[in-house]
Amino acid sequence: MARHSFFCIDGHTCGNPVRLVAGGGPNLQGANMIEKRAHFLAEYDWIRTGLMFEPRGHDMMSGSILYPPTRPDCDVAILFIETSGCLPMCGHGTIGTVTMAIEHGLVTPKIPGVLMLDTPAGVVKAEYRQEGQYVEEVRITNVPAFLYARGLTAECPGLGEVMVDVAYGGNFYAIVEPQEHFRDMADFTAGELIGMSGALRKALNAKYEFVHPEKPEIRGLSHILWTGAPKHAEAHARNAVFYGDKAIDRSPCGTGTSARIAHWAANGKLKVGDDFVHESIIGSLFKGRVEATARVGNVDAIIPSIGGWARMTGYNTIFIDDRDPFAHGFVVV
């Protein structure tokens, strides 16, 4: 029997939690972060469930673990852990992780103000603005984002048949726009959106296959993005992103914003250099931009950037005790 100890720095990015595991993470094998992610899931997923699920975490909990980079052009590697699994990329998690890692001296960048990040989804550039000891803003240049499919349909409890477009921004997103049975996310409570989202995601994954054109290890639709008219004067659009078993992102969602930018660009609503301000369900904003065009396999793509802020909320030494019947956490659905 053993008691495993993890030192965590807790914070949030624009309202959504980030738990940076600064001590106690396992050593991982693998030539790259995709292989290290696979090793973690095969042998150490109990750490993710123990730190993210109740009673040590909650439905919206999201986190990260830092590792030495697997490639010479990066400063640090990040493994993302969430209630929904080990995501290839997490935008809000990156902004929070960079903020807390720089403020606490966990990473020394080769170039001040810039961190090159080795993630399972690929290389992500993070530029940060520091004033004194605090990081005030982080802008990430994400992996290529693209429209994956148009006009997919599935049955959704409470709505009937729903049509979605699917875009990739580091994860696959089903984007629900206004249609016969859905006008605006504002017509529903967060609980109602959660109730519909799990069934819709399950139906779409059962009916269609979602595989990254260049990285077949990245597969499956993980998020539902409900859209709405903006309430904030600066925002171009509003969203509520469902992930995990019953979570709605409190931030505008970094990879979701990337997917939305790619969707708008594919529909001719954005071009290189255009800004896109995305509003969350609680009114916080991410400031996105189309940085460049790209290709992913045979698919047209864009390079998005996302700007946002994060704040630390405290330190947390967490024990996972083998004697605890809930050592590996639980979820109440």
Swiss-Prot record:
EC number, UniProt record: 5.1.1.8
Sites where the protein binds substrate: G91, H92, H223, D249, G254, T255
Top enzyme class: isomerase
Keyword list, A-Z: Isomerase
InterPro entries, per database record: Pro_racemase_fam
One Gene Ontology molecular-function label: trans-L-3-hydroxyproline dehydratase activity
Protein's recorded name: 4-hydroxyproline 2-epimerase
